[in-house]
């Protein structure tokens, strides 16, 4: 029995045009009117017209005449536009309706400069006010419309009165996941700048902690300031996780004035951070010894490092799923009855959302195939509640490896350029391979 039938059976009427927050959140801010910006071709590598043509081709393949795009990063990528409406994510509040004969952008028109209007007009994109999306959908009564149930609100789903609703995943995330040559070049440039900021930070950190007065929040501010010195810096890509000692065992910890603690010249600091540069998005984690560490810390740190390296050295068939690779990062931990409960890797946007799909590396089955040109994170970890946590993360690129009679094979290249702390390594338990991974930046 579907949810609609259950509601009828129970006498429940679902009002999808009612916003309960309007009654509760009295001082709710309005939708931002921040201006939209063009993502230059030097960074995008493909025009909006070309991307729309690819989307239309994919729609024809499933006998759809059009689709509603609700995911903000999909809209930004398709149109080569960026915004600042969402914290840490360079997107803008909007809807996009791509049909076989028309493309309509529904957005607060106050966001659009004359330059943006001319750009959209040249690309054949009509602009309508954000709150006109329902009217726009009603014009397609004779069409077969694709709606992605993961992204489309039930209210808009119910609004669509067309020949047929094709309920399928949007084709855009899979297109967006494979980076253009220009985007890959942007990652390489941005990683150098981000690496410079990180190396400056690491060189500053230990003396600053030794001198006293540094806390989880203060070092976060220091790192952000160093990144802001770099060319093309726009923002951080997510709120920094700076977890010292037992706070490092809280996977998604975020320091607040109530939880902030001082750093001491001992133990481990887990630092998960990233930046938005106009030519790429970065995401990396380093676990740093601030002074003497225990044998237990060394053992756990070394297991995580082994898992991280094991995944980074992987060679695998084109089209393999992230689930098939996930065990590579966990096997050395499993041998000791240890595990971590978050994903091992996620896609990373190109000056877009730091978390991107559809591909992931995780234990749960993720059928999305891995292809050359995709970016991923490699971030295994181990967390001992009340004690400490360890995570080591690079952003990586999937590349062609070789082709044999058994098909095409892929490999992984690390894009992140930041030293991994060797102080906590238990050198008696690692191999030559573990100790000789190259890095271009040194403290």
Can you annotate each of these PLM segments?
Residues 4-93, 98-106, 128-233, 245-247, ...:
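Flexible, acidic/His-enriched mid-domain "rim/lid" segments that flank
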Residues 7, 281-298, 389-402:
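Short, compositionally biased
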Residues 4, 26-30, 78-83, 108-109, ...:
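Short acidic, glycine/serine/threonine-rich loops at helix termini
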Residues 1-3, 433-439:
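Conserved small/polar residues in nucleotide/adenosyl-binding loops
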């Amino acid at each position: 029995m579907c949810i609609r039938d259950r509601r009828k059976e129970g006498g429940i009427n679902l009002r999808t045009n009612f916003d309960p927050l309007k009654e509760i959140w009295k001082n709710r801010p309005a939708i931002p009117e921040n201006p939209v910006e063009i993502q230059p071709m030097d960074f995008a590598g493909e025009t909006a017209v070309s991307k729309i043509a690819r989307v239309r081709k994919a729609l024809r393949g499933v006998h759809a005449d059009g689709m509603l795009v609700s995911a903000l990063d999909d809209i930004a990528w398709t149109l080569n536009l960026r915004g600042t409406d969402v914290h840490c994510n360079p997107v803008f509040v909007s809807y996009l309706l791509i049909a076989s004969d028309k493309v309509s952008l529904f957005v607060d028109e106050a966001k659009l400069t004359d330059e943006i209007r001319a750009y959209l007009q040249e690309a054949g994109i009509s602009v309508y006010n954000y709150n006109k999306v329902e009217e726009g959908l009603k014009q397609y009564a004779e069409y077969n419309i694709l709606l992605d149930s993961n992204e489309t609100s039930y209210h808009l789903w119910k609004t669509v009165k067309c020949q047929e609703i094709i309920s399928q995943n949007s084709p855009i995330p899979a297109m967006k996941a494979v980076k253009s040559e220009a985007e890959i070049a942007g990652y390489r440039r941005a990683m150098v700048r981000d690496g410079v900021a990180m190396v400056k930070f690491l060189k500053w950190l230990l003396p600053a902690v030794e001198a006293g007065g540094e806390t989880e929040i203060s070092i976060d501010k220091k790192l952000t300031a160093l990144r802001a010195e770099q060319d093309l810096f726009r923002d951080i890509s997510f709120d920094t996780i700076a977890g010292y000692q037992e706070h490092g065992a809280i996977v998604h910890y975020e320091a607040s004035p109530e939880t902030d603690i001082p750093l001491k010249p001992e133990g481990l600091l887990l630092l998960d951070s990233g930046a938005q540069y106009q030519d790429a998005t970065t995401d990396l984690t380093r676990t740093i010894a601030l002074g003497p560490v225990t044998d237990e810390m060394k053992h756990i740190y070394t297991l995580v490092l082994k898992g991280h390296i094991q995944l980074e050295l992987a060679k695998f068939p084109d089209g393999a799923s992230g689930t098939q690779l996930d065990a590579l990062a966990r096997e050395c931990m499993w041998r000791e009855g240890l595990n971590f409960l978050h994903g091992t890797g996620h896609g990373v946007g190109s000056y877009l959302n730091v978390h991107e799909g559809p591909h992931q590396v995780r234990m749960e089955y993720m059928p999305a195939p891995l292809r050359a040109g995709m970016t991923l994170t490699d971030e295994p970890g181990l967390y001992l509640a009340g004690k400490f946590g360890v995570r080591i993360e690079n952003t990586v690129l999937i590349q062609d490896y070789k082709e044999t009679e058994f098909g095409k094979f892929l490999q992984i290249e690390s894009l992140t350029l930041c030293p991994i702390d060797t102080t906590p390594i238990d050198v008696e338990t690692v191999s030559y391979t573990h100790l000789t991974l190259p890095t271009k930046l040194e403290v």
